[in-house]
Regions:
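Bacterial Sec-dependent N-terminal signal peptides
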Residues: 1-24
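Glycan-recognition and catalytic cores of secretory/periplasmic carbohydrate-active enzymes
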Residues: 22-273
Length: 273
């Protein structure tokens, strides 16, 4: 009996030590994130600029609110506020999210989930401020203008001259469906949910090869919805897997399973992994 008690005590101590070590890693990681975020904020020379990458000379490369990654930096700041509850991050998050108001009715991109949905969902969840809720809903309405009932998918890029063909859809679009599911929950309007599901279903049908890798781009005929081409895009070739695209599909279909409970989506996520 004493042996069992000693063994149990030893296991408890080891588990406690492991938990403490993990917590120390988390604290260290967030401390570094705070330093890096404060530095990035100080390098932005205007309130409506967002960090993009770095120039060869070591200076920061920035983008405007219309850049597809504009929502990432504000979202990171909201996450810092959630972890630390330090109001300096709350103030910065509000300030860096404010320029995204300009995207409220912007219909020229499929990336509104990245740009608006990501930071505004966090902002609304953490503050309860209806301004962020409405901004997310308005951006969702803008995204729906890019949906074709004939094709059954949200168009990615527009063509020069307004030519309807090819109707191009990229695997990245799966990431933007999360905003539509959120809008459906916030409004009770099933339209957002149904369009997200239809887009996911057609992506499931046409975007994957037999080896479970995904095409970056699938082209459709806007008038018939027929597939006219499947391309590698940012991958090495039309026949290769593109790692970032695989991750878009992996996250996107996992999220769709969470939102719908449809096991087909979970199966696709597992196969993508």
């Amino acid at each position: 009996m004493k042996r069992m008690l000693r063994l149990a005590l030893t296991l408890c101590l080891l588990a406690s030590a492991g938990h403490c070590a993990a917590q120390a890693i988390v604290r260290k990681s967030f401390a570094r994130a705070e330093r890096q975020t404060a530095l990035l904020d100080s390098l932005l020379t205007a309130p409506d600029l967002f960090p993009a990458s770095w120039n060869p000379d070591g200076t920061i490369k920035t983008n405007t609110a219309r850049g597809w990654i504009s929502g990432f930096f504000p979202a990171d700041i909201w996450l810092l506020y959630e972890y630390t509850r330090d109001t300096k991050w709350l103030d910065m998050a509000r300030r860096r999210t404010a320029p995204l108001d300009a995207l409220r009715r912007y219909t020229k991109t499929h990336d509104l989930g990245f740009m608006v949905g990501c930071p505004c969902h966090l902002a609304y969840r953490l503050t309860g401020d209806d301004h962020y809720k409405q901004l997310l809903i308005d951006a969702s309405d803008a995204l729906l203008t890019r949906f074709s009932p004939t094709v059954g998918l949200i168009r990615s890029w527009d063509n020069k001259g307004g030519d309807p063909n090819p109707y191009r859809v990229i695997i990245d679009n799966m990431m933007n469906l999360e905003m539509l599911f959120t809008a459906s929950r916030l409004t009770g309007d099933k339209r957002y949910h149904d369009i997200a599901v239809r887009h996911a279903d057609n992506t499931l049908k046409n975007h994957f090869r037999p080896d479970n890798s995904s095409f970056h781009i699938v082209c459709y005929d806007a008038g018939t919805g027929r597939v006219t081409g499947q391309k590698g895009g940012q991958g090495h070739s039309a026949a290769s897997a593109w790692s970032r695209g695989q991750s878009w599909g992996l996250y996107g279909f996992t999220m769709c399973y969470r939102e719908t409970g449809d096991k087909r989506y979970l199966d696709r996520a597992v196969k993508s992994a």
